[in-house]
Amino acid sequence: MPIPGESLSCNKSNSCLYQVRYGDSSYSNGDLAVETFAFDSSTSNESVVFPKVVFGCGHNNDGTFNETGSGIVGLGGGAVSIVRQLETTIGGKFSYCLTTLDSKSSSKISFGPNAIVTGPNVSSTPIVQKSPDTFYYLTLEGVSVGNEALAYYIPNSNSKASVEEGNIIIDSGTTLTYIPSSLYEGLESTLEKSISGNRVSDPQGLFGLCYELPNNGEFNAPSIIAHFTGANVELTQENTFVEVEKGVVCLTFVPSEDLAIFGNLHQMNFLIGYDLENQKVGFLPTDCSKTQ
Protein backbone atom coordinates (compact mmCIF):
# COMPACT_ATOMS: atom_id res chain seq x y z
CA MET A 1 0.00 0.00 0.00
CA PRO A 2 1.27 3.51 -0.71
CA ILE A 3 2.33 5.51 2.31
CA PRO A 4 0.84 8.95 3.01
CA GLY A 5 2.50 11.81 1.20
CA GLU A 6 2.08 10.90 -2.47
CA SER A 7 1.91 14.02 -4.64
CA LEU A 8 0.11 15.17 -7.77
CA SER A 9 0.76 18.22 -9.95
CA CYS A 10 -0.99 19.41 -13.12
CA ASN A 11 -0.07 22.02 -15.73
CA LYS A 12 -2.10 24.25 -18.04
CA SER A 13 -2.29 21.60 -20.75
CA ASN A 14 -4.16 19.28 -18.36
CA SER A 15 -1.18 16.97 -18.09
CA CYS A 16 -0.77 15.64 -14.55
CA LEU A 17 2.28 14.05 -12.97
CA TYR A 18 2.20 11.80 -9.90
CA GLN A 19 4.71 10.55 -7.35
CA VAL A 20 3.97 7.62 -5.06
CA ARG A 21 6.22 5.91 -2.54
CA TYR A 22 5.66 2.60 -0.74
CA GLY A 23 6.61 1.43 2.72
CA ASP A 24 9.36 -0.85 1.36
CA SER A 25 11.02 2.22 -0.28
CA SER A 26 9.93 1.33 -3.82
CA TYR A 27 8.47 4.22 -5.77
CA SER A 28 6.77 5.17 -9.03
CA ASN A 29 6.73 8.51 -10.87
CA GLY A 30 4.90 9.24 -14.11
CA ASP A 31 1.76 10.53 -15.80
CA LEU A 32 -1.74 10.30 -14.40
CA ALA A 33 -4.11 8.79 -16.95
CA VAL A 34 -7.75 7.76 -17.39
CA GLU A 35 -8.80 4.60 -19.24
CA THR A 36 -11.52 1.96 -19.50
CA PHE A 37 -10.64 -1.19 -17.55
CA ALA A 38 -12.09 -4.64 -18.34
CA PHE A 39 -12.04 -7.68 -16.05
CA ASP A 40 -13.04 -11.29 -16.65
CA SER A 41 -16.41 -12.14 -15.15
CA SER A 42 -16.83 -15.11 -12.81
CA THR A 43 -20.50 -15.48 -13.76
CA SER A 44 -20.52 -15.03 -17.56
CA ASN A 45 -18.31 -15.09 -20.64
CA GLU A 46 -18.54 -11.32 -21.03
CA SER A 47 -15.99 -8.95 -19.55
CA VAL A 48 -17.00 -6.49 -16.86
CA VAL A 49 -16.14 -2.99 -18.08
CA PHE A 50 -15.32 0.03 -15.90
CA PRO A 51 -14.94 3.37 -17.74
CA LYS A 52 -12.91 6.35 -16.56
CA VAL A 53 -10.60 4.54 -14.16
CA VAL A 54 -7.73 6.74 -12.97
CA PHE A 55 -4.30 5.09 -12.96
CA GLY A 56 -0.62 5.97 -13.10
CA CYS A 57 1.52 5.36 -16.17
CA GLY A 58 4.92 5.01 -14.53
CA HIS A 59 8.07 6.16 -16.32
CA ASN A 60 10.43 6.09 -13.35
CA ASN A 61 9.92 3.05 -11.13
CA ASP A 62 12.23 1.38 -8.67
CA GLY A 63 11.98 -1.29 -6.00
CA THR A 64 9.44 -4.11 -6.17
CA PHE A 65 8.64 -3.51 -9.84
CA ASN A 66 9.80 -6.07 -12.40
CA GLU A 67 9.23 -7.09 -15.99
CA THR A 68 7.21 -10.19 -15.08
CA GLY A 69 4.30 -8.08 -13.86
CA SER A 70 2.21 -5.46 -15.61
CA GLY A 71 2.12 -3.15 -12.61
CA ILE A 72 0.74 -2.76 -9.10
CA VAL A 73 -2.95 -2.77 -8.19
CA GLY A 74 -3.76 -0.43 -5.32
CA LEU A 75 -6.07 -2.23 -2.88
CA GLY A 76 -5.77 0.24 0.00
CA GLY A 77 -8.47 2.43 1.47
CA GLY A 78 -7.19 5.67 -0.08
CA ALA A 79 -9.28 7.68 -2.54
CA VAL A 80 -7.32 6.71 -5.68
CA SER A 81 -7.11 2.95 -5.10
CA ILE A 82 -8.95 0.66 -7.51
CA VAL A 83 -11.09 -0.51 -4.60
CA ARG A 84 -12.33 3.00 -3.85
CA GLN A 85 -12.82 3.92 -7.51
CA LEU A 86 -15.01 0.85 -8.08
CA GLU A 87 -16.59 0.93 -4.62
CA THR A 88 -20.20 1.49 -5.68
CA THR A 89 -20.01 -1.29 -8.29
CA ILE A 90 -18.23 -3.90 -6.18
CA GLY A 91 -20.05 -3.01 -2.97
CA GLY A 92 -16.79 -2.54 -1.09
CA LYS A 93 -16.00 -6.26 -1.37
CA PHE A 94 -12.88 -7.96 -2.69
CA SER A 95 -10.82 -11.04 -1.90
CA TYR A 96 -7.54 -12.62 -2.88
CA CYS A 97 -5.79 -15.97 -2.50
CA LEU A 98 -1.99 -15.87 -2.55
CA THR A 99 -0.16 -18.99 -3.67
CA THR A 100 3.04 -20.22 -2.02
CA LEU A 101 6.46 -19.15 -3.26
CA ASP A 102 7.14 -22.46 -5.02
CA SER A 103 3.71 -22.71 -6.67
CA LYS A 104 3.42 -22.81 -10.46
CA SER A 105 -0.11 -21.38 -10.27
CA SER A 106 -1.12 -17.73 -10.25
CA SER A 107 -2.67 -16.02 -7.26
CA LYS A 108 -6.32 -14.96 -7.65
CA ILE A 109 -8.24 -11.78 -6.89
CA SER A 110 -11.99 -11.17 -7.05
CA PHE A 111 -14.19 -8.09 -6.77
CA GLY A 112 -17.87 -7.73 -5.94
CA PRO A 113 -20.51 -9.82 -4.13
CA ASN A 114 -18.95 -13.13 -5.24
CA ALA A 115 -15.77 -12.14 -3.38
CA ILE A 116 -17.45 -12.62 0.00
CA VAL A 117 -15.66 -15.34 1.99
CA THR A 118 -18.17 -17.64 3.68
CA GLY A 119 -18.36 -21.06 5.32
CA PRO A 120 -17.97 -22.74 8.71
CA ASN A 121 -14.17 -22.50 8.65
CA VAL A 122 -14.06 -18.75 8.06
CA SER A 123 -12.86 -16.59 10.94
CA SER A 124 -13.41 -12.83 10.77
CA THR A 125 -11.94 -9.84 12.53
CA PRO A 126 -13.10 -6.20 12.56
CA ILE A 127 -11.39 -3.47 10.57
CA VAL A 128 -10.58 -0.61 12.94
CA GLN A 129 -11.10 2.91 11.62
CA LYS A 130 -7.90 4.93 12.01
CA SER A 131 -5.92 7.51 10.09
CA PRO A 132 -4.51 7.37 7.46
CA ASP A 133 -7.33 5.57 5.67
CA THR A 134 -4.89 4.01 3.18
CA PHE A 135 -4.31 1.17 5.63
CA TYR A 136 -6.57 -1.60 6.92
CA TYR A 137 -6.04 -1.72 10.67
CA LEU A 138 -6.71 -4.92 12.62
CA THR A 139 -6.22 -5.79 16.29
CA LEU A 140 -3.61 -8.44 17.04
CA GLU A 141 -4.13 -9.65 20.61
CA GLY A 142 -1.10 -11.94 20.60
CA VAL A 143 0.50 -15.04 19.12
CA SER A 144 0.95 -18.56 20.43
CA VAL A 145 3.31 -21.46 19.84
CA GLY A 146 1.81 -24.69 21.13
CA ASN A 147 0.65 -23.98 24.68
CA GLU A 148 2.84 -20.90 24.99
CA ALA A 149 0.76 -17.72 24.59
CA LEU A 150 2.43 -14.36 24.00
CA ALA A 151 0.29 -11.26 24.39
CA TYR A 152 0.60 -8.02 22.41
CA TYR A 153 0.58 -5.33 25.11
CA ILE A 154 0.62 -1.58 24.66
CA PRO A 155 4.24 -0.43 25.17
CA ASN A 156 4.71 1.58 28.38
CA SER A 157 1.11 0.91 29.41
CA ASN A 158 0.25 0.80 33.11
CA SER A 159 -2.05 -2.14 32.46
CA LYS A 160 -0.66 -5.39 31.06
CA ALA A 161 -4.20 -6.33 30.11
CA SER A 162 -4.35 -3.50 27.57
CA VAL A 163 -4.31 -4.24 23.87
CA GLU A 164 -4.52 -1.25 21.58
CA GLU A 165 -7.21 -1.56 18.92
CA GLY A 166 -5.90 -1.29 15.38
CA ASN A 167 -2.33 -2.11 16.43
CA ILE A 168 -1.38 -3.79 13.13
CA ILE A 169 -2.18 -3.38 9.45
CA ILE A 170 -2.73 -6.18 6.95
CA ASP A 171 -0.89 -5.52 3.70
CA SER A 172 -0.67 -7.74 0.62
CA GLY A 173 2.23 -5.63 -0.68
CA THR A 174 4.61 -6.15 2.25
CA THR A 175 6.52 -9.44 2.32
CA LEU A 176 7.43 -9.94 5.98
CA THR A 177 5.44 -9.50 9.19
CA TYR A 178 6.68 -6.74 11.48
CA ILE A 179 5.87 -6.81 15.20
CA PRO A 180 7.17 -4.88 18.25
CA SER A 181 10.48 -6.06 19.70
CA SER A 182 8.83 -6.98 23.00
CA LEU A 183 6.54 -9.47 21.26
CA TYR A 184 9.19 -10.64 18.82
CA GLU A 185 11.73 -11.46 21.53
CA GLY A 186 9.27 -13.72 23.31
CA LEU A 187 8.34 -15.42 20.03
CA GLU A 188 11.95 -16.02 19.04
CA SER A 189 12.82 -17.43 22.45
CA THR A 190 9.83 -19.77 22.42
CA LEU A 191 10.57 -21.02 18.91
CA GLU A 192 14.23 -21.60 19.69
CA LYS A 193 13.22 -23.95 22.51
CA SER A 194 10.87 -25.82 20.15
CA ILE A 195 13.14 -26.28 17.14
CA SER A 196 15.92 -28.84 16.90
CA GLY A 197 18.47 -27.57 14.45
CA ASN A 198 21.72 -25.75 13.88
CA ARG A 199 21.08 -22.04 14.39
CA VAL A 200 23.12 -19.81 12.06
CA SER A 201 23.55 -16.10 11.43
CA ASP A 202 21.33 -14.38 8.91
CA PRO A 203 23.35 -13.96 5.69
CA GLN A 204 21.29 -10.88 4.75
CA GLY A 205 21.41 -9.10 8.10
CA LEU A 206 17.62 -8.71 8.18
CA PHE A 207 16.27 -11.75 10.01
CA GLY A 208 16.67 -12.64 13.67
CA LEU A 209 16.18 -16.42 13.77
CA CYS A 210 17.79 -18.59 11.11
CA TYR A 211 18.67 -22.27 10.83
CA GLU A 212 20.80 -24.42 8.60
CA LEU A 213 18.63 -26.53 6.34
CA PRO A 214 19.58 -30.22 6.76
CA ASN A 215 20.93 -32.08 3.73
CA ASN A 216 17.70 -34.06 3.48
CA GLY A 217 15.76 -30.79 3.27
CA GLU A 218 13.65 -31.64 6.29
CA PHE A 219 13.23 -28.73 8.69
CA ASN A 220 10.46 -28.87 11.26
CA ALA A 221 9.03 -25.86 13.05
CA PRO A 222 5.82 -25.63 15.09
CA SER A 223 2.82 -23.76 13.76
CA ILE A 224 2.20 -20.24 15.07
CA ILE A 225 -1.29 -18.90 15.70
CA ALA A 226 -1.90 -15.18 15.20
CA HIS A 227 -4.74 -14.19 17.53
CA PHE A 228 -6.74 -11.36 16.02
CA THR A 229 -9.93 -10.15 17.67
CA GLY A 230 -12.45 -12.86 16.77
CA ALA A 231 -10.08 -14.73 14.45
CA ASN A 232 -7.32 -17.23 15.18
CA VAL A 233 -5.13 -17.57 12.08
CA GLU A 234 -2.90 -20.67 12.16
CA LEU A 235 0.34 -20.17 10.26
CA THR A 236 2.21 -23.22 9.03
CA GLN A 237 5.95 -23.58 8.56
CA GLU A 238 5.41 -22.63 4.91
CA ASN A 239 4.24 -19.22 6.12
CA THR A 240 6.69 -18.66 8.95
CA PHE A 241 10.06 -19.81 7.59
CA VAL A 242 11.55 -19.00 4.19
CA GLU A 243 14.76 -20.14 2.51
CA VAL A 244 16.70 -16.88 2.17
CA GLU A 245 19.67 -18.53 0.47
CA LYS A 246 20.63 -22.09 -0.37
CA GLY A 247 20.64 -24.10 2.84
CA VAL A 248 19.43 -21.34 5.20
CA VAL A 249 15.86 -20.77 6.40
CA CYS A 250 14.78 -17.77 8.49
CA LEU A 251 11.76 -16.73 10.53
CA THR A 252 9.48 -14.36 8.60
CA PHE A 253 8.52 -12.36 11.69
CA VAL A 254 10.93 -9.48 12.27
CA PRO A 255 11.06 -6.85 15.02
CA SER A 256 10.13 -3.23 14.33
CA GLU A 257 9.21 -0.25 16.47
CA ASP A 258 7.41 1.38 13.55
CA LEU A 259 4.02 0.37 12.20
CA ALA A 260 3.26 -3.32 12.78
CA ILE A 261 2.40 -5.13 9.53
CA PHE A 262 0.89 -8.55 8.79
CA GLY A 263 2.72 -9.33 5.54
CA ASN A 264 1.94 -11.46 2.52
CA LEU A 265 4.05 -14.51 3.42
CA HIS A 266 1.67 -15.03 6.33
CA GLN A 267 -1.31 -14.63 4.01
CA MET A 268 -0.30 -17.43 1.62
CA ASN A 269 -2.86 -20.22 1.25
CA PHE A 270 -5.64 -18.21 2.84
CA LEU A 271 -8.65 -16.89 0.97
CA ILE A 272 -8.81 -13.42 2.49
CA GLY A 273 -11.96 -11.38 2.00
CA TYR A 274 -12.43 -7.68 2.69
CA ASP A 275 -15.95 -6.45 3.39
CA LEU A 276 -15.59 -2.69 3.66
CA GLU A 277 -19.34 -2.20 3.97
CA ASN A 278 -19.43 -4.24 7.18
CA GLN A 279 -15.85 -3.36 8.15
CA LYS A 280 -14.37 -6.83 8.53
CA VAL A 281 -11.70 -9.14 7.09
CA GLY A 282 -12.29 -12.89 6.78
CA PHE A 283 -9.68 -15.68 6.68
CA LEU A 284 -10.34 -19.11 5.16
CA PRO A 285 -7.50 -21.69 4.98
CA THR A 286 -7.33 -22.62 1.28
CA ASP A 287 -5.04 -24.31 -1.21
CA CYS A 288 -4.73 -21.21 -3.38
CA SER A 289 -3.15 -23.19 -6.24
CA LYS A 290 -6.49 -24.97 -6.74
CA THR A 291 -8.93 -22.04 -6.47
CA GLN A 292 -10.80 -21.02 -9.60
Task: Briefly describe each language-model feature range.
Residues 1-53, 59-61:
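Signature of the N-terminal lobe/flap region of pepsin-like aspartyl proteases
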Residues 23, 41-42, 54-60, 88, ...:
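Aspartic protease catalytic domain
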Residues 30-34, 69, 164-165, 220:
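Short, solvent-exposed loop/turn segments enriched in Ser/Thr/Gly
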Residues 71-82, 179, 261-264:
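Short beta-strand-centered segments at strand-helix junctions
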